Amino acid sequence: MRLNKIILSFVSALVILFSTSVASFAKVVGDKIILGAAISLTGKYSSNGVHTQNGYNMAVDRINSMGGVKVGGKTYKFDIIYYDDESNPKRAAQLAERLISQDGVEFMLGPYSSGLTKAIAPVTEKYGVPMVEANGASRSLFTKGYKYLFAVLAPANLYLDVAIETAVELNGGKPVRIAQAFEQDAFSQDVRLGILDAAERTGSKIIIDDKLPKELNDMAATLVKVKQMKPDVLVVSGHTKGALTAIRQIAEMKVDVPMLAMTHCDAAKLSKQHGKNSQYALCASQWHKSLTYKDDFFIKKSSL
């Protein structure tokens, strides 16, 4: 399972949130508390949105199978109202308004991506509706004083900084030369800031600092410079499409770089889609299969 670590935190967050809340303030149908979520089922983030929906459904299934949550001496289970935000921030904010003001939802689940989370957070704050989110990692989300935003993942600036530290360690403790290319979104720019911090901390040097094209379908210009300047590390963050483009073009252009560090390898299913070409890429992840946690629920779900 890709999401087990995040989902465990998500389950815990929901249980804590509801066990300390009053059910009369929630939308309740029978014995079910209704949650709301605007998710990217179409558009740029559709594959990640489906993963997010699957994760939320899995968490709710687990909570319900364990008997639900007790609030004020009464037991409740969960159900979720979903709308497709079309990977569009404006649409996401509109749907958050609809879920709260029309559907009566009093507890929200976050969308996919920092940008869409940023679009929805002001809406949930305005109405005082708690939102638990697992996919908005931009640290700027957590510097605005939001009182109703609860996240269960590491901030974006910590995703790949360890790659620079590892490269320095493998280089005998000496500084390294870094090439980097990033999408122009809140998440990727925070990943970039983490690399800049790591470079300063280790005395390393950024020799290529590029922007990925908006379509995320061609990074040849960056890779030409990588071949010419021969950095010790190449860092790429462009969500799922950017990861796929990077692996494909690195192979096509026969780029040889000692270390490649990227985000969204799991979501892009790199090992399945690109096989040996994706080997040895260092990838940011909220969990890893080598972690020892397991139980019957995750074993059964991961085998489906």
Named regions from a protein language model:
Residues M1-I34:
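Short, low-complexity disordered leader/linker segments with a strong preference
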Residues L41, K147-K211, V233:
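An alpha-beta-alpha
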Residues K27-V28, I34, S47-N54, M66-T143, ...:
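Beta-alpha junction/loop-to-helix N-cap segments that form part of ligand/metal-binding clefts
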Residues K44-N54, A186-V191:
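Glycine- and acidic-residue-enriched helix-capping/strand-helix junction motifs
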Residues I34-A38, D79-Y82, E106-P111, P130-N135, ...:
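Structural recognition of the beta-strand scaffold that forms the well-ordered cores
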Residues A92, V152-P175, D190, D218-A220, ...:
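Hydrophobic alpha-helical segments within soluble ligand-binding/sensing domains
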Residues K44, M58-M66, Y83-E86, L95-E106, ...:
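Structured segments of extracytoplasmic/periplasmic soluble domains
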Residues I247-L304:
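Extracellular/periplasmic periplasmic-binding protein-like sensory domains
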